């Protein structure tokens, strides 16, 4: 009886997963779905407490050892730097792997049947598609050119790329569903056909590559099983042609992408979006910083959840993004899960994480070789293709961060491992009592609930903080920021410490001494966040601690040489300190900014001092008279400076040319 309840609970859990979406949090799905998963595990554990005849697979098996080692390394790598983000990442990983282990044992003990998981995952795919088509139709009715703004189609997920990857991960279940009942078969066919237009619209290249690898794997196996050597050669020839087509695309289509960027044609714009390599180039720069981060702590890494805090340390100006260089856009991940693990958990952590996949691959190959029924064998091939596609996507995106992606991946793993041990004769069961496992999983679920609950409340108040700050209601900003911060939540989803918002509020309320306390605390939590450093330096200057101000402005510029606010502020500090040459040197390295009013306001007085210094040094009356005739307004000084930049000469050279 309880087995049926658990099966239905799993099915309903999977169907409701996409609907767990709260607009009142910073990320509408991340924390809510962790809470949902932890609550579901508690329910399953409660239902299992009275299940006495549950056989436990020995914990010394390779998969369990690899998972345990990975989690242990995640904890050890964070030693000495265990932050609120470490709590979050660790709680998420613990609850996800607990879901895997419980599901494996439920399948192994026949308490849960695979069909319920298959149907539930098919349901996720169908619901995702319904949401995607709803967004497509809604935005089209609103007059949006949806092929140019495909990012508006997100369904129940955070962005279009995550939607595309979730549809890919449902593909193996759709294919397995073709061998199920007539109703499930029809739904699977509808799902696969409906996914094609959505995937084309989204244009997520990592998913296209994953689909290509998935199809290639299926093709290779099909050729191996069904055809003779000639047809295999023909098939391999087709693969070579496909590779050549990709080469042609890279070398002929991509270079011409700029030519169609300004085209008004919808199809041309779509192909430009697909061919545009700017996103990939940007990500390689993220990866460069990540490699530099790993080299500093190659064995154990910087600690779970700390990539986002450490990333700016390795330079932001090379990102080729104005918003990143100026700290208005921040990064939370390197868009490569394996690189993220390498940075946070070190080389040991990455090796152990890869071992988890290695064990699963070994089990799948064993199952494919030793399964006699063709339909069942193909099911394992679909799972193999799905896991391989996931690995491909993980090299260019961050499915590891997302609960829904991890649930589907863990279901891949659970089906594989339970099937593997069902075919292998276990010499002995685990000597650890079942109740101990239940206590452990209960503790993990409660830990995930506590961390998630505090972060959920923190994100709710952070959203209110954003709104109050945008409308410059500083009293409200301070109130909501105080409510947002707690033991498990000190940095928001944009990698900005909550104390920074408190500092901003106090600064605008003229409580400068208190703002300094909060900015120093924010700096402690995020020592390389340039907005935090800039505000801390400005506060030091306001309170008369000029040396500290200069030190921190220089640190901000060292991290991002193109950080305009810090350059302007440092130039102003040098100017006020009568270090005019240094003030000119700092502001002269800025790119000419025609929109920032402070740029011109600060530049002209510094240029006046520079002109006076040149005239005093040269002591040339002719030059002085000519400049006096040419410069009658401050705008004329600015024009001379612009001319020097256009002529690619120094400001002093431009002045001397006026003799």
Identify the meaning behind each predicted range.
Residues 491, 495, 529, 563, ...:
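Residue-level recognition of tetratricopeptide repeat
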Residues 487, 491, 525, 559, ...:
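Structural marker of alpha-solenoid helical repeat scaffolds
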Residues 140-152, 254-282, 288-295, 304-343:
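Interfacial juxtamembrane loops and adjacent helix segments
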Residues 500-504, 531-541, 565-572:
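Conserved alpha-helical positions within TPR/SEL1-like repeat arrays
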Residues 1-75, 83-89, 95-123, 177-189, ...:
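Transmembrane signal-anchor hairpin modules in multi-pass inner-membrane enzymes, especially those
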């Amino acid at each position: 009886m309880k087995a049926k309840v658990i099966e239905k609970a799993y099915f309903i859990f999977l169907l409701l997963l996409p609907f767990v979406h709260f607009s009142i949090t910073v990320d509408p799905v991340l924390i809510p779905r962790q809470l949902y998963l932890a609550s579901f595990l508690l329910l399953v554990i409660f239902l299992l407490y009275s299940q006495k005849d549950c056989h436990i697979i020995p914990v010394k098996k390779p998969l369990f050892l690899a998972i345990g080692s990975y989690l242990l390394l995640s904890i050890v790598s964070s030693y000495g730097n265990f932050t609120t983000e470490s709590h979050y990442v660790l709680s998420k990983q613990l609850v996800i792997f607990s879901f895997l282990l419980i599901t494996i044992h439920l399948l192994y003990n026949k308490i849960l049947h695979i069909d319920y998981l298959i149907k539930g995952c098919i349901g996720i795919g169908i619901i995702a598609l319904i949401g995607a088509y709803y967004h497509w139709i809604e935005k089209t009715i609103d007059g949006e050119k949806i092929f140019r703004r495909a990012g508006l189609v997100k369904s129940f997920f955070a962005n279009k790329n995550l939607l595309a990857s979730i549809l890919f991960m449902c593909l193996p279940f759709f294919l397995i569903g073709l061998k199920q009942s007539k109703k499930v078969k029809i739904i699977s066919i509808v799902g696969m056909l409906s996914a094609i237009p959505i995937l084309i619209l989204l244009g997520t290249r990592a998913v296209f590559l994953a689909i290509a690898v998935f199809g290639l794997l299926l093709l290779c196996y099909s050729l191996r099983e069904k055809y003779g050597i000639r047809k295999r050669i023909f098939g391999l020839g087709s693969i070579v042609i496909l590779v050549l087509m990709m080469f042609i695309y890279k070398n002929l289509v991509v270079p011409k992408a700029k030519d169609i960027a300004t085209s008004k044609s919808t199809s041309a714009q779509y192909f430009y979006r697909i061919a545009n390599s700017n996103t990939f180039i940007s990500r390689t720069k993220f990866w460069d910083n990540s490699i530099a981060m790993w080299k500093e702590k190659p064995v154990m890494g910087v600690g779970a959840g700390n990539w986002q805090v450490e990333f700016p340390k390795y330079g932001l100006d090379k990102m080729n993004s104005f918003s990143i260089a100026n700290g208005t856009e921040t990064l939370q991940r390197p868009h490569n899960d394996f690189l993220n693990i390498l940075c946070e958990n070190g080389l040991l952590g990455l090796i152990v994480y890869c071992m988890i996949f290695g064990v699963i691959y070994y089990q799948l190959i064993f199952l494919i070789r030793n399964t006699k029924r063709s339909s069942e064998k193909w099911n394992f091939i679909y799972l193999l293709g799905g896991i391989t596609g996931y690995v491909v996507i993980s090299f260019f995106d961050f499915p590891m961060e997302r609960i829904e992606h991890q649930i589907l991946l863990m279901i891949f793993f659970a089906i594989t491992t339970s099937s593997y041990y069902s075919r292998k004769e276990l010499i002995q069961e685990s000597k650890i009592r079942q109740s101990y496992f239940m206590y452990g999983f209960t503790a993990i679920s409660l830990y995930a609930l506590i961390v998630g609950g505090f972060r959920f409340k923190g994100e709710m108040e952070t959203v209110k903080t954003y709104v109050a700050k945008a409308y410059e209601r500083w009293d409200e900003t301070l109130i909501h920021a105080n409510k947002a911060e707690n033991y498990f939540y000190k940095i928001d989803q944009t990698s900005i410490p909550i104390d920074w918002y408190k500092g901003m509020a106090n600064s605008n309320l003229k409580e400068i001494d208190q703002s300094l306390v909060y900015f120093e605390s924010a700096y402690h939590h995020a020592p390389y966040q340039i907005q935090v450093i800039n505000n801390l330096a400005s506060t030091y200057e306001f309170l008369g601690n000029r040396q500290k101000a200069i030190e921190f402005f220089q640190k901000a510029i060292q991290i991002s040489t193109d950080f305009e606010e810090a350059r302007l502020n440092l130039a102003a500090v040098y100017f006020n300190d009568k270090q005019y040459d240094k003030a000119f040197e700092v502001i002269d390295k800025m790119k000419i900014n025609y929109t920032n009013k402070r740029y011109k306001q600060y530049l002209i007085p510094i240029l006046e001092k520079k002109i006076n210094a040149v005239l005093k040094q040269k002591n040339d009356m002719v030059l002085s008279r000519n400049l006096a005739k040419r410069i009658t307004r401050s705008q004329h000084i600015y024009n001379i400076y612009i001319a020097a930049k256009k002529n690619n000469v120094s400001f002093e050279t431009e002045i001397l040319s006026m003799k």
